[in-house]
Every structure is written in structure tokens, then in C-alpha cells.
């Protein structure tokens, strides 16, 4: 893994890297633990939450978070996420307004963020790649035990939760996969299960009556 450049506009140290394995090559985003800025409400180790988000997306059969793993790099342990070749002028709001055929993908992202307790779903954290696939990125501040949801995705508020989403959320009420739970504290795992139960019992996407749950 070789660092190419530092990514601009990131609050933590974030690097574009080239990854080589035999004849295979790709680019990734490397976020080392040493480059994290201290936060009052999250312990150090945001890189592990990036990996947990990917593992949760896989466990829920959503496939909306790019492949993300723990790796040792030039600046020590960090997360490495597959680099998405995104259409740069697309974001959540443009996709919602102009691509109704992708609304189900956005609904899945909305449900994922509730279960993961995402505190930072900005419009630019929703990508559209050159193959017209929707991706969710930047999950370092997810999975807090206290409910901290902050997101721009409120357009589906009040809609009935689709059965296909209920089917992938309900199993989390009983058990959180080890690939996720081993990256979180026991309190965070229990809170994840409570959020899964809450959205399933409610049967609908929540409405933000306060107008304050935005990143």
C-alpha cells in the first residue's frame, strides 16, 4: 500500500493510496488512527467504526458501503476503504431529485443510518459511481450508545418500512454478527439492537419533528 496524496477537506488525516496484490491493483482511502482528531463524544478508534459500518452493510445484504478493512499503513493501523470512482457533481440531494429509480437505494441508506446511529450523513457522503450505483461513505462517527442520529435523509419520513428492509433489520434484534460486535463496546451493541427493534416496531421511517437532526 503506497500513499498517493492527502485528501482535502477532511477533518481527520485521510489519504488516497494505491493498493497492489500480485497483479491486482486498485485505489483506496486510508484513515489511520494516529490521524484522528480527539472528539468529546467518541473514544479514539474511529477507523474501527468505518470497518463496522461495512460489516453491518454486508450483514444486512445492502452492499452500500465500499469494502473496508483494518490494515497497517505508513502511519500505523487504520481503515482502508475501496476508492469509489464517483460522479463528482452528484450527491444525496441531486440523486433524490433527479433519479427516482434510485429511491429504494436511498431508503436502504436511510434505514442503515438509523440502525448504525449515523451522526454525520451529509449530502456528499452519498456517492453515485460511474456505473450508476449508490454508495455510502464516512462512517467514523456511527454506533454511539446514545441516540445521536443526524442525517440529511428525511424525505422518506412517515413512509411504511418496506418488508425487504424489515427482513434484514429484524435479525439484528436477536443477534449482532461478530464481525460487527467485536469492533464495538457491549453498550454500543445493545443500543444497535434496540434501534433495530425500534424501527421494526414502529414500522415506518421516522419523522424529525425537531428540525435539528441535521449534521
Protein language model features and the residues they cover:
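C-terminal catalytic region of ATP-dependent kinase domains
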Residues: 6, 43, 129-215
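Conserved ATP-binding subdomain of kinase catalytic cores across diverse folds
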Residues: 1-97, 101-119, 123-124, 130-137, ...
Amino acid at each position: 500500500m503506497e500513499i498517493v496524496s492527502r485528501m482535502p477537506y477532511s477533518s481527520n488525516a485521510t489519504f488516497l493510496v494505491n493498493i497492489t496484490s500480485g497483479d491486482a491493483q486498485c485505489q483506496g482511502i486510508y484513515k489511520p488512527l494516529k490521524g484522528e482528531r480527539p472528539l468529546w463524544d467518541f473514544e479514539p478508534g474511529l477507523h474501527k467504526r468505518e470497518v463496522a459500518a461495512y460489516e453491518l452493510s454486508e450483514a444486512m445484504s445492502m452492499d452500500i458501503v465500499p469494502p473496508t478493512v483494518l490494515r497497517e499503513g505508513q502511519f500505523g493501523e487504520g481503515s482502508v476503504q475501496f476508492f469509489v470512482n464517483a460522479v463528482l457533481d452528484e450527491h444525496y440531494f441531486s440523486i433524490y431529485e433527479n433519479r427516482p429509480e434510485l429511491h429504494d437505494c436511498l431508503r436502504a441508506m436511510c434505514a442503515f443510518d438509523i440502525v448504525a446511529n449515523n451522526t454525520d450523513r451529509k449530502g456528499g457522503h452519498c456517492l453515485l459511481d460511474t456505473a450508476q450505483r449508490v454508495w455510502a461513505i464516512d462512517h467514523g462517527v456511527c454506533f454511539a450508545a446514545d441516540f445521536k442520529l443526524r442525517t440529511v435523509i428525511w424525505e422518506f419520513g412517515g413512509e411504511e418500512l418496506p418488508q425487504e428492509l424489515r427482513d434484514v433489520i429484524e435479525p439484528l434484534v436477536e443477534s449482532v454478527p461478530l464481525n460487527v460486535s467485536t469492533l464495538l463496546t457491549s453498550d454500543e451493541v445493545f443500543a444497535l439492537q434496540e434501534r433495530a427493534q425500534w424501527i421494526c416496531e414502529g414500522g415506518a421511517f421516522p419523522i424529525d419533528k425537531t428540525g435539528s437532526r441535521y449534521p
